[in-house]
Every structure is written in structure tokens, then in C-alpha cells.
From Swiss-Prot:
It is found in: Cytoplasm. This is Probable cytosol aminopeptidase. Keywords: Aminopeptidase, Cytoplasm, Hydrolase, Manganese, Metal-binding, Protease. Its main location: cytoplasm. The gene is pepA. Gene3D superfamilies: Leucine Aminopeptidase, subunit E, domain 1, Zn peptidases. Mn(2+) 2 binds at residues 260, 265, 284, 345.
Length: 491
């Protein structure tokens, strides 16, 4: 799909499908819209009246028009109340238009949307993101794709002439989101630790990033006993991925994104039983997928920020070599961990990844992981949990969430809860009592960051959508890429 920019007035546009956005309870046709309705022989007013269209957010109505009108189809989309108008409103409204246009076999859509905050650049970028994310289709694993009908070929953004840079930025970010979606959606026999390392190498080759892949023996030399303990049972070699983007000159900040990378999680010897969703555990590398997606986007945008993209990637499998419940592992900072549940493995891999990252002398680290079901119980499917002792970093991430539309909610890091992780024979256990499980998981990770501002994002909910939700169809969402890119780009 091509996105074109036009300075053609709404009254002069002619083509296949015209899409117009209206605010809730402000659907009266005055000014330019009144003139357009007159030109269209009252079709707009008739559509609003007959369909009882009120402009509710993301609601749409559609009609075909007679041959004497300069457009063949009309879509009206609601923006909700004016006082609730956000940049995300445009993203979701554009997605709604794209879906209706595709369903109605529109080839070319002329899109008339208002500006958010009088900012044509941010508005154009958001619209382009919403359209592309909504219309993305993943048919890689279908021999005969179901969705092979008419596709939207071109969308013209009316009144956005000169915003080529905004569209280019949207394309760069969306390319990272789609990479993350593809990695998460692919089954575990398609995306393995080896595949993830090859993907990172391809990003480095395509965009000039530095890369280091630590093999098992390299990790052994660094004392990564927690990560390697999880990797013991797999027949596939673990891969510790470290991509680095460095700008020309002196960077204004040095940051790291660390993603959990379990390409499949069986639960280990504490195997996931019937009804546990074990068949969905290909998604347990959603953090690493977002990390690589962010790397792809950042490498194209080229900000004046040094960014490290790190993931310890392996499977959590079952074999005679597997770690046992009750084993004691030693992480690379010397801390010992009693494994009281082999299905709490993600935090073990992250422990060594965080120790490694903490030694790089950075300004801040953000890790993201499909870490706990407890976070999903607390916040549902749309919202990631934010855990950090650093108020400034929390504020940066909350602002990035607001701009990107990827929701987060700051959760407490109640230090008293660490009592539940104490072990009688090691420094700590890898799980605590059931209450506050997402908090104790974050407190566990906190033990492996000593010198750097740090935040943890538990993305177990929003990494996957069971049903259509805005610009996310059912399946992998690519959650985290846009949030992290906005964080990196923030001043």
C-alpha cells in the first residue's frame, strides 16, 4: 500500500473512496463539509441520518454513491469527543477506515482527517502507522491464503502535502513492528535461538549496526549460570545477542533495551499441564522480538543516542539434562538462586542479561518480558506493567506510552515482598508466594542491576491479541516497539 500526500482541497478530490472523520455529537455539516454535501446531492447528511451516525470513536458508516458523483464510495469514521482527542485517536480511526476500505474493495482512498494539536507531522505519522498496522496480513504459513482478495493500493492524505518525512518515519517504525509481529507469530519450529541470532545479524548487515553473538562457551566464561541453567535441556544452542547502534559523534544518551527470549517454554520439569496454554508458548520471546524490532527501526531513524539491544535466547525444554526443581544456579554477579519452579525461567535468563548490560556504563536500561500471568490478572490484555524505582525513568516511559498508544501502568515495587523470595540455602529463590507475583518477579530482576537506572515492563498481556483490537488483528501485536522507539527519541 502506498501513502500519498495531497494539497488538493476536499471539495476537489475525486476517486474511488472518500473517508471523512467527524467528532462525536459534532456531525453537523457546516462550512466545507456543508459545501461538499451540497455537491454530493445531500448524500452525507442522508448517511448520517439514516445510519444514526454520532461520531463515536472508531465507529464507521459506509455507502456507495451514484455515478454522477465524483467519488464511488464514502466512509464516515468517528473520532469521539473533542475533549478526548489524542494522537492515538487518529491512529485508531485510520485503522478503522483501512479495514472498511479493504472490506469494500476500495483501491484508492482519499482521507480527510483533522490535525491533532495543530501538528501536521505527528498527525500524518500516526495516520500512516494506523493504516499500515491495520492492513498488515501474515499469510506465511498458509498454502492457500484466505485473504487474497482486493487490497487497498493507495491512500491519499488530504491536506498533508509536505509531510514526506513523517510518512518515512512511520514506515521505519512500522517495519520494526512487523518484524516483531512475524517473530512472535511464527511457531517454535520456525523461530529458534539460531533464527533469532540470524535475524539480528541481518539487521546489523542491512543497517550498519555492531553485533556480537555470545555462544555457549562465551557465556560459560562470563559465569552466566542462570541463563545456561535454563538452556540445559534444549538440543538447540543458546544465543546471547548484543546489537549496538552508535550515532556519529558524541551521543546525548546511552541506553539499553533488554528482551526476554524464550523461543519456546514447556515449563521445564515443572511442565505446563493441560489447559495451561502450552501451545501458545512460542510467544515467550515477545520481549526479544520487540527488542529486534526496535533495533530495526532505530537503525533507520538514526537518532543521536547510543542504544544497545540485548537478549539471552534459548528454549525451556525437558530432557535428562534439564535443571531440576531445587537446583541452585549461580548468576554472573555471583548471586545464587534456588530454582523452586523451572517454569519461572524467564527471570533466570534476564538475570544474566541484566548483569551484562549493567556493566556497559549506560544511562538507563529497560527490559521487557512476557514474565507473569499475575500481571495479566492485574492489568488485563491491553496494558503492560511498569516496575521501576526511578521516577524520572518512569516519567519518560509514561510519556512514550502516551505518544505511542502502547499502554503501561506503573506498579509498586514493594521491597517488603522480597521476603517471599528468600531461600534457606541460597541467596534467593526464583519464585515467591502467589500473591503479588508480578511484583516479586520484578524484585527478583532488581537484584541484578547495580549501577544503572532500570525499568522492567511485563508485557505478558499486550504481546498477543485474541481478537481484533484497533490496528491489531488477532495474533501477535508487536507490542513494545513503538513505545521503546518513542522512549529512545525522547529528549
Amino acid at each position: 500500500m502506498a501513502i500519498q500526500l495531497s494539497d488538493k482541497p476536499l471539495l476537489e478530490w475525486a476517486g474511488d473512496t472518500l473517508a471523512i472523520a467527524l467528532f462525536e455529537d459534532a456531525v453537523e455539516l457546516t462550512g466545507e463539509l456543508g459545501s461538499l454535501d451540497e455537491k454530493f446531492a445531500g448524500i452525507l447528511k442522508e448517511l448520517i441520518t439514516e445510519e444514526e451516525f454520532t461520531g463515536k470513536a472508531n465507529s464507521t458508516v459506509f455507502t456507495r454513491v451514484s455515478s454522477n458523483i465524483p467519488v464511488r464510495k464514502i466512509i464516515l469514521v468517528g473520532l469521539g469527543k473533542t475533549e478526548a482527542f489524542k494522537i492515538e485517536t487518529l491512529r485508531r480511526a485510520a485503522a478503522a477506515v483501512g479495514k472498511v476500505g479493504k472490506k469494500q474493495k476500495s483501491k484508492v482512498i482519499g482521507l480527510s482527517f483533522p490535525l491533532w494539536n495543530n501538528d501536521p507531522t505527528a498527525s500524518a505519522q500516526a495516520i500512516a502507522e494506523g493504516l499500515q498496522l491495520a492492513l498488515y496480513q501474515d499469510n506465511r504459513f498458509k498454502s492457500d491464503p484466505e485473504d487474497k482478495g482486493s487490497q487497498v493500493e493507495t491512500v491519499e492524505l488530504l491536506g498533508f502535502a509536505g509531510q514526506e518525512a513523517a510518512i518515512n518515519r512511520a514506515n521505519q517504525i512500522v517495519s520494526g513492528v512487523i518484524l516483531a509481529r512475524q517473530l512472535v507469530a511464527a511457531p517454535a519450529n520456525s523461530v529458534t535461538p539460531i533464527t533469532m541470532a540470524e535475524t539480528a545479524q541481518q539487521i546489523a548487515q542491512d543497517y550498519g549496526l555492531q553485533i556480537e553473538i555470545l555462544e555457549q562457551e562465551d557465556c560459560e566464561k562470563l559465569g552466566m549460570g542462570a541463563f545456561l541453567g535454563v538452556a540445559l535441556a534444549s538440543d538447540l544452542p543458546p544465543k546471547f545477542i548484543h546489537l549496538t547502534y552508535k550515532p556519529e559523534g558524541t551521543p546525548k544518551r546511552k541506553l539499553a533495551i533488554v528482551g526476554k527470549g524464550l523461543t519456546f517454554d514447556s515449563g521445564g520439569l515443572n511442565i505446563k499441564g493441560a489447559g495451561s496454554g502450552i501451545e501458545t508458548m512460542k510467544i515467550d520471546m515477545g520481549g526479544a522480538a520487540a527488542t529486534l524490532g526496535a533495533a530495526k527501526a532505530i537503525a533507520q531513524i538514526k537518532p543521536n543516542v547510543e542504544v544497545h539491544f540485548i537478549s539471552a535466547v534459548t528454549e525451556n525444554m525437558i530432557s535428562g539434562k534439564a535443571m531440576h526443581p531445587g537446583d541452585i544456579l549461580t548468576a554472573s554477579n555471583g548471586k545464587t538462586i534456588e530454582v523452586n519452579n523451572t517454569d519461572a525461567e524467564g527471570r533466570l535468563t534476564l538475570a544474566d542479561a541484566l548483569v551484562y548490560t549493567d556493566k556497559l556504563g549506560l544511562d538507563a536500561i529497560v527490559d521487557l518480558a512476557t514474565l507473569t500471568g499475575a500481571n495479566v490478572i492485574a492489568l488485563g490484555d491491553d496494558i503492560a506493567g511498569l516496575y521501576t524505582p526511578d521516577d524520572a525513568l518512569a516519567g519518560q516511559l509514561e510519556q512514550a506510552a502516551s505518544e505511542s498508544g502502547e499502554k503501561i501502568w506503573r506498579m509498586p515495587l514493594e521491597e517488603k515482598y522480597f521476603e517471599g523470595l528468600k531461600s534457606g540455602i541460597a541467596d534467593m529463590k526464583n519464585t515467591g508466594p502467589r500473591p503479588g507475583g508480578s511484583i516479586t518477579a520484578a524484585l527478583f530482576l532488581k537484584q541484578f542491576v547495580k549501577d544503572t537506572a532500570w525499568a522492567h515492563l511485563d508485557i505478558a498481556g499486550p504481546v498477543w491479541a485474541d481478537k481484533e483490537n484497533g490496528y491489531n488483528g488477532p495474533g501477535a501485536t508487536g507490542y513494545g516497539v513503538r513505545l521503546l522507539v518513542d522512549w529512545v527519541l525522547s529528549e
